[in-house]
Amino acid sequence: MSSNFKTPLSVYVLYDKDNTKGSETYEKIYHLLCRNSSRPFEDGLDIPVFFRTDMANQITPIDINFSNKTIAILLVDDNMYCNTIWDEYIKELLVKQDNGALKIFAVKLSKYAFDINPLLQEEQFICLKNENIETDWHEFQIRLYDNILRYLKSYKVGQKLKLFISHSKKDKDHLGESTAISLRDYLRSDTKLDSFFDVNDILDGHQFAQQIQSGIASSLLVIIESDTYSEREWCRIEAISGKKNNVPSILVNVLNGVSSRTFPYLGNMPKIRFNGKWDDVIILLLRTALDQYYEKEYLEQLVMKCDLQNTSILPVPPELMNLINIEDNIKSILYPEPPLGREELEVLNKNGKITSFVTPSQLYSNMNKIQDKKIAISISETPEALTKGIGKAMFDDLSVEIARHLLVTGAKLVYGGDLRIGGFTKLLCDLSCQYGIKEKSDPSTIYFTNYFAWPIFNRLSKSDIAEFKYDRVEIVKTEIPKGVGEEDKGKFFEPTTPSKMFLWANSLSIMRKEMEENVNARIVLGGKIVNFKGRMAGIFEEAICAIQKKHPIYLLGGFGGASAQKVKLRQKNYLKKQKPMRIIKI
């Protein structure tokens, strides 16, 4: 793939360092727009989300060349308003906005927010009822999704999203019709919602098909599934019209009795049981639209950059309905993560036309031949990551995504970790467990091997060992270093004295050498360069062990830390006599 690949969109969350909720808000927005590492096989929006804050009296500039479009979300509280360092920074952002390089969305978290810069127009502000993102989380999501949708789709000022409500008028309790009217009235009673939704009543299926085709770029569909919805011809026509045109659609379930038959083409879309709160429905609808629009642009760019022949893209998981109008030359379908399960693929593969259904991760795995190879991951957070706008949410997500992609290729994971709460060992164990369950593999199948050095492995309880076994994780306890007395071999202690520090350092070195004996390649990113417990920074030592064994090393230097230092050494040719390393700067 071309090295200048750009994502369709990236988002930067800007907050003052004294904003006590700033980091937490960034992580919530990251999980909202990108992914949550604790749920690696759920469908995230996959939009890159970074942050910027005033560290050491300076703010790192936003990289407008990272993506085709860039959004800056300003969290304007009293701290940002009072801190003069933001004055010049916001001026620079406004210049970039005037040049079309990015779009600013400011969140009003202070009564003085409108005065932070006279050129920052009031209509650019997301104004919340209580001026508190945590309290007004539902409202914030709606405003944020709407603003991002408009910018991504290049809507004109005042242009509305066309919302179609498909419902049955023949329920005995009139629940389908009354629910549709309730949604329409709710949207029209809220001036902000009415400003961006053009709510349409569908008179009949034929008219809907014409309407949807004439405004497909800005159309959304809400299906109210009541008792008689599947029985009504026009309802079925409306549902099929939405599917054929890939209109972002959701299903709102209001069943109040027995439905004699469920229309088969009401599946493969988000579904919600109506609980009387329309905000939940609107959030799901806008998220679904943003997901499809972003994935469509991303996959189209991927097909072009990778020069994929005879490939068509779908912004949703494929189903047989999607294959009806596929051109004869198309042999492969590229669709968003996560991959479909085997049972669905078995049905799709009987279509007799399309020979391959792949996600981006599977696309890459097909290009690599690392089945059953043991790939070691060297990763830890670095203080430098903060100045680069990379928080814990992204670091955790990165480690899980690398591991997930490796598992998809058929590789096995190897890591030298400990038992810290929130550490990478726990993350990788959870991933191994979820992947095994998803693949329906034999419980004895091992996906991840974790090496424990002495005396760390003395902290392993039977409960820990049982959990590792359940998670399909192999535990390797490495050799105890020389000089440890018999009475200490079964004990755990912290490296609090020079003699204990010496034993810890020796033990970690033994663990790293033994681990390297049993791997095929290593991926390196982050890494402490101070306050480490070994003879040197752990990632440095692991890289040296890999070089000595002539194993390939893949350095991701864009996250700072020891891996970045290693990249600099390589670039200065200090290691030119060693086996070449692959350097990846992200």
Predicted segment positions?
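C-terminal interaction surface of TIR/SEFIR-family domains
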Residues: 1-35, 58, 81, 108-186, ...
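Extended, compositionally biased accessory segments flanking or bridging domains
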Residues: 1-53, 200-201, 295-308, 357, ...
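Conserved beta-strand-loop-alpha-helix hinge of the TIR/SEFIR fold
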Residues: 18, 62-113, 170-171, 213-259, ...
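A short acidic (Asp/Glu
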Residues: 22-27, 84-87, 116-118, 175-178, ...
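Conserved BB-loop
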Residues: 28-64, 81-85, 182-213, 228-233, ...
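Acidic/glycine-enriched connector segments
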Residues: 31-35, 60, 64, 70-71, ...
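Conserved small-residue-rich
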Residues: 161-224, 305-340, 373-411
